[in-house]
Amino acid sequence: MAFSAPVIRAFSQPAFTYVVKFPYENWKEEEHLLWSLLAPGTERLMIQLRNCAPHPEDDPVREDILCSLADQHYGAIFAKACYIATTTLMGQKQRTPFPRCDIICQSEIGSEHLHCHILVGGAGLSKRNAKISRATLLGLVMAELTQRCKQLLALRPFEPAEANIFHLLKRIEREAWSGHTGNWVQILQYKDKRGDLHAQPIDPLRFLKHYILPKNRLISPSSKPDVCTTPDNWFILADKTYAHTIINGLPLLEHNRKAYLQELESEVIPGPSTMAFGGRGAWEQLPEVGEQRLITSNASTAYKANKKEKLMLNLLDKCDELNLLVYEDLVSACPDLLLMLEGQPGGARLIEQVLGMHHIKVCAKYTALTFLFHLHPDQLLTSNNKALKLLLIQGYNPLQVGHAICCVLNKQMGKQNTICFYGPASTGKTNFAKAIVQGVRLYGCVNHLNKGFVFNDCRQRLIIWWEECLMHQDWVEPAKCILGGTECRIDVKHKDSVLLQQTPVIISTNHDIYSVVGGNTVSHVHAAPLKERVLQLNFMKQLPQTFGEISPVEIAELLQWCFNEYECTLTGFKQKWNLDKVPNSFPLGDLCPTHSQDYTLHENGFCTDCGGYLPHSADDFVYTDVASETTSGDCDPGNLGDTDGEDSKSEASEVDFRPSKKRRVISATPPSSPVSGPSLSTFLDTWQSQPRDEDELRIYEEQASQLQKNTKSTPEREEAQLGEPQEPQPEPDPTAWGEKLGVCSSQQPGEPPVVLYCFEDLRPSDEDEGENIGGE
C-alpha cells in the first residue's frame, strides 16, 4: 500500500520550475515501445484500459486496472526519474548526498510531448546558476532513463525499435553533458530591459495550488480523463491532465488530491482575511477617501506620438525582435508595416533612418563574434564541416585559425585587426571570407570604383569585407587606421565625415596588398606597418569543383567550439599556441603522426590538438558496434543487447566537445591474399606500445605466433633451396614479359594487343608476402 504525501506547509527558497520533455517525437504512435522499455509487464493492463467505460458508469474492471497501475505506468517512471535527477542535482549544489530541499515532480501527457514539471527550491540554487543547470539536469534525467532500460536489457535483448529509443536517450545524454540541451529542458524566465533572459523565481505553494493540483488524471493518450479519473476526484472546470505526481519522494494519490488542495487553500496559503487591508476584513466597508483636488502646474503634459512616429517605433521593435538588418529583410518579414510607413511623406528616408538607428544599436550591443552566436546559437561542431576541411587542405590547424578569428572578431587581437586570405584562384579564399561575413550579416564592402568614397559603406557595421584588396596611395593612410582597428574619420557621400569605430576587416585577394600603387610607381614604404596590422593566411592548393560552398552555420560551429574551449584574447592565444609574437604569416599546422590523411575519411571525428581527422581502424570487425548497425538498418537482435556499443563508432560519428579517443590502426589480412606472416620490422613498428583491449591482444598474439613460425621455417627452406641444383635460365624477351603480364600480341597486324587477365589475379611474390600483414 502506497503512502500519500502529507500536505507541504513550507517550501524552501529560492524556488524555480523546470519542464523536461521526453526526447522522442513519435511516442504517441509507438506508445507500446514506452510500455515495454520503461514499464514492462503493463502492456496487457494498458490495452484493457482502452475498452473500459467512462464514469458515471460503474466498471469494476476499470477500478482494478487503475489500482494496479498506480505508480507502475511509464508516466510514473518518468516522474520518478526526474525526481531522482533533481535530488542528485541539489546534492551536487549543496555538496552532500542528502540535500535539504523541496522537490515536486508531475508528469503530464501534452499535445506534442510527454513532459514533467519540476518545482525545486533550496540552498545552492540561485537566479544566476538555475539557468545554467538545465544541461546538468537533462543529463541526469537521461542517465536515469537509460539505466531503467538496461534493467530490461538484463532480461532480454532489445527489439530494433527499442534499440533506436535507447541510443536516442544515450545521444541526448552525451549532448547534455557537453552543454547542449536541444530545447528538451526549459526553465521559467523573464526578460530584462536589455532583452536578456534570466531565471524567474516563483512562489511554489501558489504555483502548486493554481497549476499543479487542479487537473484530472490521464495515463495514456489512447485513453480519456473520465476513464482514468474516478467521479469523486473529478475537477469539473479543469481542462488539463496529469499522469503522476511526486511530492518530496512520496506519490500524491488520486483520492487525496482534492483534500490536499482544500487544506492547502484553508490553512497553508493565506486567504483574503489575513491580507493587509488596514486592519479590516475582506468584505468590510472600505475606508473613506477625502476630497482630492488637482494641483495646478505649469509643467507640460506628456508628449503623445503621432501615427508616423508610432510606425517608426513599431518597425524598430520588429527589427530588434526578428534581427532585420536590410531592406530585403523588412519586405519578407513585415511587408504590411513597411507599406504603411512607405505611404507616409518621405517614407523611404524614414525607413533608412530606422535601419540606421537599428545598426547603431546592434553595433553598440554586440561585436561581430557575439552577434554571430546570437544569430546561430548552440551550434555543434561536426567532423564533416567544410570550413574544417578547407583549413586542413591548405595546411593550417583549423582550431588555431578559429581561435585567431574569434579573437579578431571579438576585438581582442590587439593591433592585428585584419585577416587576409591570400592565394591564387579557386583555393577557397572568397568561399571562406563570404561565409564569415554572411554569418555576421551586418557587414560593409570596400568599393574601389568610387575612389573618392572608398569606405562609404563601412560605417555602422560589425565587420568589413575587402574583396580583391588593392592598396593605392589615395587611401593607404585611412586603410592603415582601419586595418589596425584605430578610430578614424571617413568621408561619406552627400554627408559630413563620420567617425569609424574599431571594426574587424576580412580581406580576400590575390594581389600584394603591401605594395602601394600610385600613378606609374610602386612603393614598399608602407609594407612594414601594413604587415603589423594584418594576419595573413596563404591558400595555395586549388579545391575540386565539387567542394561546395561553406555555409555560415559551419563557420558558427567552428568559432563557437573555439570560443567555448579557449580564452579568446591575445594573451590567451599566445599562451595556448606557445607564441612569443603573432606573425604576419599565420603559422602552418603540425598534424599528429597518425593523422596524416587525405582529409576524406572524417567519420571518426577530429583531434582537439592538431585539428586533423582521427584515423580509421583497418579492422572493421573490431570496432563494429550496435549503434552503427542499428542506424544502417541491419539490426541483429543478438547484438542489440550489447551495451558496449554505446562507446564505439556511434559516439565517434556524433562529434561534440568531447572528441573520440584515438585508436591504433591494425591492418587485417586481405581475404584474397595468401596466408603469410608479418615481417619483423613491420611487427615492431605496429606494436610499439602494449595492447589496450582484448581485441588488440588477440591480434598481437596471432601475429607473434605467425612470426615465430616463419622464423623457424626459414632455415629449412634455405637448406632445401641449397640442396637443389640450380639451372641457368635464359632472360625473357619482350614477348615473354608481355605474356607474363597478361598481354599477348594480336594475330592481325595493326590491332592492339589482347589483355588476358587482370593484374589483381597475379600471386604476390615471396618478397612481398611479409608486407600483407601487420602494417599499414
Swiss-Prot record:
Bias (Low complexity) ranges: 667-681
Catalytic site: 211 (for nuclease activity)
An example molecular function term from Gene Ontology annotations: helicase activity
Record text on cofactor binding: The endonuclease active site can probably bind other divalent cations.
Catalytic activity reported: ATP + H2O = ADP + phosphate + H(+)
PV NS1-Nuc domain span: 11-271
Domain free text: In the N-terminus, the endonuclease region is involved in binding to the origin of replication. In the middle, there are the ATPase and helicase activities. The C-terminus probably contains a transactivation domain.
Name of the protein: Initiator protein NS1
Organism listed in the record: Human bocavirus 2
Gene name, Swiss-Prot/TrEMBL: NS1
